[in-house]
Amino acid sequence: MRGKFITFEGIDGAGKSTHIEWVAERLRARANVVTTREPGGTPLGEDLRQLLLHRKMHLETEALLMFAARREHIAEVIEPALARGDWVISDRFTDATFAYQGGGRGLALDRLATLEQWVQSGLQPDLTLLFDVPLETASARLAGAREPDKFEAESRAFFERTRTEYLRRAAEAPQRFRVIDATRSIDEIRVALEEIIATL
């Protein structure tokens, strides 16, 4: 039986990464679970991640590199794991590209959709958990945590557009998305996550 593919999404500071390993541990009771991330997840993908997070580049180049890293990730990690019957949890996937490069940067969504179709050949997550927080909350969580990368250092307006695009995508695909109110406590969020994963 083919495995299931779960993605965690949200703007920087939403707190999604805090819960990934917790969810993975819950799911390991019923399947082998592979945790991974984007950009990254493969040796080439991790090299591209460093370029994407720290080097200035044209907006189109940024989007193309995101999808190049994703193609490698799908071919080397995601598809083989799903074919084995493993479950895959990824810290970000294509929704992040639509949110950050489409919403935040303003790249045409139809161009991103063309790349998505080419690179993914129809692959979509079975479940996307969108951790949603107001900008003030996200900024407070990031303040002083570490040296910000290129995206974390973006403007408030950038993150407003990014968040708006995330929520638009969630509204367009309610069968796939579950929006998590990430202003709640860790314990409250985990109660909600427990209820969601019980339905898988």
Curated annotation (Swiss-Prot):
EC main class here is transferase
Q: Output the Gene3D superfamilies linked to this UniProt entry.
A: P-loop containing nucleotide triphosphate hydrolases (3.40.50.300)
Q: Determine the domain of life of the protein's source.
A: Bacteria
UniProt: ATP binding residues? G10, I11, D12, G13, A14, G15, K16, S17
Q: What is its EC number?
A: 2.7.4.9
TM ranges are none
Annotated catalysed reactions: dTMP + ATP = dTDP + ADP
The record ties this protein, via CDD domains, to: TMPK (cd01672)
Q: Name one GO biological process term.
A: dTTP biosynthetic process
Q: Which residues form the signal peptide?
A: none
Q: May I have one GO cellular component term?
A: cytosol
Molecular function in Gene Ontology: ATP binding; dTMP kinase activity
Reply yes or no: does the keyword Nucleotide-binding apply.
yes
Is Kinase given among the entry's keywords?
Answer: yes
- InterPro entries named in the record: P-loop_NTPase, Thymidylate_kin-like_dom, Thymidylate_kinase
Ordered alphabetically, the record's keywords are: ATP-binding, Kinase, Nucleotide biosynthesis, Nucleotide-binding, Transferase
Tell me which family the UniProt entry assigns to this protein: Belongs to the thymidylate kinase family.
List the PANTHER family hit by this protein, alphabetically. Answer: THYMIDYLATE KINASE, UMP-CMP KINASE 2, MITOCHONDRIAL
Q: What does this protein do?
A: Phosphorylation of dTMP to form dTDP in both de novo and salvage pathways of dTTP synthesis.
| Name listed for the protein in its UniProt record | Thymidylate kinase
Organism whose genome encodes this protein: Cupriavidus metallidurans (strain ATCC 43123 / DSM 2839 / NBRC 102507 / CH34) (Ralstonia metallidurans)
Which gene name belongs to this protein? Answer: tmk
